[in-house]
């Protein structure tokens, strides 16, 4: 099973299907800025926003990290996990230069299974192997309460929809 999104108006295929509201999030282990392994279970009891994107070195991806850094201050008991294939060094450099301290950057460096399991792996086109742009919101028990696979990778996600779910 696959989905189609667009990159600069050209269709690209995304493997599998993004988790839908009501489903249980799959466990994952990703790489933190200090190169340690971080698992979903480390955020047990907190709501999670998974801001997933191709690379922090693009304008739209960087804008999403900045916006979620701001929104993270508006909701309680919530962590924002910004997930990309970027090396942890690049993620850390970006957040340091931008003064962003309300989000946690995580890399798929040692776990490409995350992309497959979360239905965001681009399998053709110029961004093959990277993540499609998506936002997945989990409750305290890792149940999906919101998900959006952005149809055009060069567009920002629906921040208000994600925030409204957290404020409901």
Swiss-Prot record:
Disulfide bonds join 61-95. GO terms for molecular function: thioredoxin peroxidase activity. PROSITE patterns: THIOREDOXIN_2, TPX. Keywords: Antioxidant, Disulfide bond, Oxidoreductase, Peroxidase, Redox-active center. It holds the Pfam family Redoxin. Residues 19-168 form the Thioredoxin domain. It catalyses: a hydroperoxide + [thioredoxin]-dithiol = an alcohol + [thioredoxin]-disulfide + H2O. The active site is at 61 (cysteine sulfenic acid (-soh) intermediate). Gene3D superfamilies: Glutaredoxin. InterPro entries: Redoxin, Thioredoxin-like_sf, Thioredoxin_domain, TPX, Tpx_CS, Tpx_Peroxidase_subfamily. It comes from the Bacteria. It is an enzyme of class 1 (oxidoreductase). Its EC number is 1.11.1.24. HAMAP family: Tpx. NCBIfam families: PRK00522.1. Thiol-specific peroxidase that catalyzes the reduction of hydrogen peroxide and organic hydroperoxides to water and alcohols, respectively. Plays a role in cell protection against oxidative stress by detoxifying peroxides. Belongs to the peroxiredoxin family. Tpx subfamily. Homodimer. The active site is a conserved redox-active cysteine residue, the peroxidatic cysteine (C(P)), which makes the nucleophilic attack on the peroxide substrate. The peroxide oxidizes the C(P)-SH to cysteine sulfenic acid (C(P)-SOH), which then reacts with another cysteine residue, the resolving cysteine (C(R)), to form a disulfide bridge. The disulfide is subsequently reduced by an appropriate electron donor to complete the catalytic cycle. In this atypical 2-Cys peroxiredoxin, C(R) is present in the same subunit to form an intramolecular disulfide. This is Thiol peroxidase. It comes from Salmonella typhi.
């Amino acid at each position: 099973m696959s989905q189609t999104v667009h990159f600069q108006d050209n269709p690209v295929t995304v493997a599998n299907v993004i988790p839908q509201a009501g489903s249980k999030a799959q466990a994952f282990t990703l790489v933190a800025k200090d190169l340690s392994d971080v698992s979903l279970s480390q955020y047990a009891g907190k709501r999670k926003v998974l801001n997933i994107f191709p690379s922090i070195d693009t304008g739209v991806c960087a804008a999403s990290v900045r916006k979620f850094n701001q929104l993270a201050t508006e909701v309680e008991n919530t962590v924002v996990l910004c997930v990309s294939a970027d090396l942890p060094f690049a993620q850390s450099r970006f957040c340091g230069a931008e003064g962003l301290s309300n989000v946690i950057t995580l890399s798929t460096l040692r776990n490409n299974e995350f992309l497959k399991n979360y239905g965001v792996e681009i399998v053709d086109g110029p961004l093959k192997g990277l993540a499609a742009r998506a936002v997945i919101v989990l409750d305290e028990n890792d149940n999906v309460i919101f998900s959006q696979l952005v149809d055009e990778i060069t567009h920002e996600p629906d921040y208000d929809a994600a925030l409204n779910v957290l404020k409901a």
